[in-house]
Amino acid sequence: VKVIPITTPSGTFKVWTKRFGNNPRLRVLLLHGGPAMTHEYFECFENFLGPEGIEFIYYDQLGSAYSDQPKDDSLWVTERFVEEVEQVRIALGLGRDNFYLYGQSWGGLLAIEYALKYPQNLKGLIVSNMMSSVPAYAEYAEKVLMPAMDPAVLAEVKAIEARKDYANPRYMELLLPSHYQQ
């Protein structure tokens, strides 16, 4: 486990990382969904990537799981998260010759934004379960994800979103069973 200090406009905070495997030629930094999800749903990768000799790094973004949880809404912007990923990359010694970035869902958008700003630092980019356009994703959510939800659950989710009450624990209680299998 390596805890990395991250400098932000609101001060210095710590983010949690954990390396699995050892392959100086092939290192994959995992960007989880959310924001504010956790690395834990990537733990199944130990059964697949590890035996293939692929080194990968779990990483809880600021505001997630084992990392610091600042109460400053100004930190929750994509550009700041991109700079956070760059600080993590530097602290872990990842470079163009060995650094692959894997992003899933929100982490996919973050990975794309990182690659657009810092293409010189990457050997490869992997985007999973995400479109490269927020408007396209919003349309997909409206046409595919929402109709699959229980109407009462969807109504409660939309009410929470209308209030912009995303920190409400009920919000994740409603969304997780609708979008993730047990």
Map each language-model feature to its residues:
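Structured loop/turn residues at beta-strand edges in well-structured enzyme cores
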Residues: 23, 52, 83, 94-97, ...
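Active-site loop/oxyanion-hole signature of alpha/beta-hydrolase fold enzymes
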Residues: 58-106
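Conserved hydrolase catalytic core segment
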Residues: 96-141
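Flexible "cap/lid" loop of the alpha/beta hydrolase fold
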Residues: 125-166
